[in-house]
Amino acid sequence: TTAGEAGQPRSGTSRNTVLVVGGYGSVGGLICQTLAARDDLDLVVAGRNPSKAAAFARSVGGRGVRLDLDDQSTWEPACRGVDWVLMCMDQTDLSFVSFLFAQGIHYADITASDGFLRAVEGLAPRRSMALISVGLAPGLTNIMAAWGAARLDRVERIDIGLLFGLGDRHGEAAIGWLADRIFDSARDGRVVDMAFGFGAGRRTLYAVDFSDQHSLARTLPTDAAWTGVAFESRLATAALFGMGRAFAGSRLMRDVSATVMKRLRFGSPLCSASVAVSGWSKGERVATSVHFSGAVEARVTAQLAALQFEQVLSGPLVAGVHHTHQ
């Protein structure tokens, strides 16, 4: 949604002050390292532990502050003089985002939880810009899907595939997020075979509730959108999603699987995405696909998030909530 132009940096200059919540976490820390290389912004590292925030901030040339999402008394001091807040933690409600919009502070978020992003869309800020669907998935996958959809007269469906290596070191929050969705009793049971580029071949993908499929269905003229996940090991993929189906809703098995995923370390740190868009063009049925391949999911997510965020900083600020592909 668009609600007119947003304000300039609060300093009155072209220099922005960017506060990264969760800035010393696995993805947030990598984003901070990338943004710290820019000479046109001031970086603030924020988190619940002020000592960790200060120590990490010193290592990247920024400053650290305490910000606890559960303690509203920390919000105003931490956000004083801030132009942008880049959120690298999942939230349970809109209190903090509403606070930012009331202050005219701009907002970006790397979460992959559609329920929260839909709630942010509903706030429709008039003085702030919000950038959501940031990173790899959502983020790059949205852009890939939009690119494919733009080449068709009518889009019938969008299939998004994510392929992860088991040699990667994923953050605890990311593993917990994925385990929650694999063992979700309401998880879509559909399975799709999809081709990945760069020699990865065809893979069997299992549905996972990433937000990209939902935001694309809301913002692009498509009949359907779907996101699935596979791991580099076909055996591990079948075993994990088989457990998710057999023990759907079991907190115990969810926790056991999360522990196994955290400790399991074999294969490569592969991180790939494939997007297939099918539909009609000039009266003929056509399909197009786009592939991406990288290594180390946290690093890829951070680099893409920083790049997408930097693109917004370099352009005009438009109030309202915008997905990356918009």
Per-region residue spans from a language model:
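N-terminal Rossmann NAD(P)H-binding glycine-rich loop of SDR-like oxidoreductase domains
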Residues: 19-36
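Rossmann-fold NAD(P)-binding glycine/threonine-rich loop
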Residues: 111-130
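N-terminal Rossmann-like NAD(P) cofactor-binding module of classical short-chain dehydrogenase/reductase
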Residues: 83-89, 107-109
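N-terminal Rossmann-fold cofactor-binding loop
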Residues: 46-50, 68-69
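C-terminal helical cap and adjacent loop that interface with cofactors, partners, or active-site loops
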Residues: 266-326
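ADP-ribose/adenylate-binding Rossmann-like module
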Residues: 99-117
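Conserved Rossmann-fold cofactor-binding substructure of NAD(P)-dependent oxidoreductases
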Residues: 68-82
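Active-site-lining helix/loop region of Rossmann-like oxidoreductase modules
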Residues: 21, 150-278, 283-287, 299
